[in-house]
């Protein structure tokens, strides 16, 4: 089962995210990753197959992971193999997300939103990111309106 953590606040996000993911290891997983809002005003992704300890080593290698906002995820594969590309978080355009569950209509959404050829992974989660990004662009970058339409598009159990 996937584990999810998010943080925004005055402390350094990377340590909070990594410690939170380490606390979720008992749930079982095959890969882990984080996304954080960097000092350069960009969202950065770091993800890997394997243990949270391997993710911590990758984070240490980054030149600047200081951030006060981020999300983290441990994945238990339901769609696609155990690869770095399939690890969360996923990004499509301006949307970066993590997700737990199964989106049953992800094949239909891939076709409906013309995502074929734009996906880097084999996951329903990246399809969800692509759909939300498309809606965000269509709805004049209104996040609330985009999310309202987004949840109406998805079929399945997810969080």
Per-region residue spans from a language model:
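Conserved short alpha-helical segments that host acidic/polar catalytic motifs at enzyme active sites
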Residues: 1-159
């Amino acid at each position: 089962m996937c584990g999810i953590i998010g943080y925004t606040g005055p402390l350094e996000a990377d340590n909070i995210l990594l410690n939170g993911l380490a606390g979720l290891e008992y749930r079982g997983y095959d890969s882990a990753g984080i996304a954080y809002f960097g000092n350069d005003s960009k969202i950065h992704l770091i993800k890997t197959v394997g243990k949270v300890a391997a993710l911590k080593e990758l984070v240490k290698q980054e030149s600047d992971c200081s951030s006060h906002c981020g999300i983290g995820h441990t994945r238990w594969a339901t769609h696609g193999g155990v690869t770095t590309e399939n690890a969360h978080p996923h990004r499509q355009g301006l949307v970066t997300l993590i997700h737990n569950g199964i989106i049953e209509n992800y094949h239909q959404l891939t076709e409906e939103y013309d995502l074929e050829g734009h996906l880097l992974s084999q996951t329903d989660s990246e399809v969800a990111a692509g759909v939300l990004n498309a809606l965000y662009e269509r709805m004049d970058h209104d996040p609330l309106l985009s999310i309202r339409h987004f949840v109406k598009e998805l079929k399945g159990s997810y969080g």
